[in-house]
Amino acid sequence: IVEDDVAFGPENIGVPREEIGKRIDFALDAVGMQAFRHSTPSRLSGGQKQRIAIAGVLAIMPKIMILDESTAMLDPKGRREVMDVIKKLNKERGMTVILITHFMEEALEADRAIVMHRGEVVMDAAPEEVFSRSEELEAYNLTLPRAAYISKKLAEGGMPVKGAFNAEELAEEICASLQKI
């Protein structure tokens, strides 16, 4: 049962029984999974399972959460669900979240992006700054977010677009560029 999975961490660190129920409520509310409290985890989607896993960590009440490839092997909808929870925890609850990912669109949503290569930090800046250094990223076998890649290729082809990093920015840049023609 989902609530048993969420209770596992607090039980193992000795949280009193009466407090565990409150923490389960808090954690399931935080990840939007209260309606699945009595569900069988094996019947949940990949994104829902990841949200329950995050709830299990939240029930411990950490100040910092480290998530390693938390959206790997999820479909786009599941990936979006998990990223929405991560952003909510950071923005609304003030939790520090360290997200390790190979999905550049996810890295773009961070306050700070750190690129490591062979155990060394090679870039540490705002995501927009990191992604503006496309040649360096390519040297580390990292790709640009899709919109940034398209923006770069359009600029290389002569379309006057500034570096766009997401679909909305790219659409605005293309429209502005077309109005100049």
Q: What spans do the regions from the language model cover?
A:
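Helix N-cap at the start of a conserved alpha-helix in ABC-type nucleotide-binding domains
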Residues: 76-78
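Catalytic Walker B motif of ABC-type/P-loop ATPase nucleotide-binding domains
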Residues: 65-68
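Conserved ABC ATPase "signature" region
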Residues: 11, 18-36
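ABC ATPase nucleotide-binding domains
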Residues: 137-181
